């Protein structure tokens, strides 16, 4: 190679491959809640394939398993635990203020 052409070649940078989120021994099944819960957002939505870093086949199987778990009511359709807790706090504070004003 000429000396002028060698100057333009970049050295390849080393990068570390991440481990796949689903190991070969893991079964994608609606009963495997520990596996399924990793692929659901805080709101209860199914995370996208780009976020999960899954293959197309794995993402399809995960989606089917999540939908089966929702239908069999082992998984909620929407996760509103935070909102319910906040609402109960608000009603508790409102009732205490109502009682305080009535005592006068």
UniProtKB/Swiss-Prot annotation:
Q: Which UniProt keywords apply?
A: Chloroplast, Plastid, Ribonucleoprotein, Ribosomal protein, RNA-binding, rRNA-binding
The record's annotation in Gene3D superfamilies points to: Ribosomal protein S18
Q: Which GO terms describe its cellular component?
A: chloroplast; mitochondrial small ribosomal subunit
Q: Where is this protein found?
A: Plastid, Chloroplast
Q: How does it assemble?
A: Part of the 30S ribosomal subunit.
Q: What is this protein called?
A: Small ribosomal subunit protein bS18c
Pfam families in the record, alphabetically? Ribosomal_S18
BP terms from Gene Ontology: translation
Which GO molecular function, any one, fits this protein according to its record?
structural constituent of ribosome
Q: Which HAMAP family match?
A: Ribosomal_bS18
Give the matching PANTHER family.
30S RIBOSOMAL PROTEIN S18, SMALL RIBOSOMAL SUBUNIT PROTEIN BS18M
Query: What's this protein's family per the entry?
Result: Belongs to the bacterial ribosomal protein bS18 family.
Q: Which InterPro entries did the record assign?
A: Ribosomal_bS18, Ribosomal_bS18_CS, Ribosomal_bS18_sf
């Amino acid at each position: 190679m000429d000396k002028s052409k060698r100057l333009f070649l970049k050295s390849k940078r080393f990068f570390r491959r991440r481990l796949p989120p689903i190991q070969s021994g893991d079964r994608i099944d609606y009963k495997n809640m520990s596996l399924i819960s990793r692929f659901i957002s805080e709101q209860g939505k199914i995370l996208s394939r780009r976020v999960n870093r899954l293959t197309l086949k794995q993402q399809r199987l995960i989606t089917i398993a999540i939908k089966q778990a929702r239908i069999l009511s082992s998984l909620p359709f929407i996760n509103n635990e935070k909102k319910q807790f906040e609402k109960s706090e608000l009603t508790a504070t409102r009732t205490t203020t109502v009682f305080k004003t009535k005592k006068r």
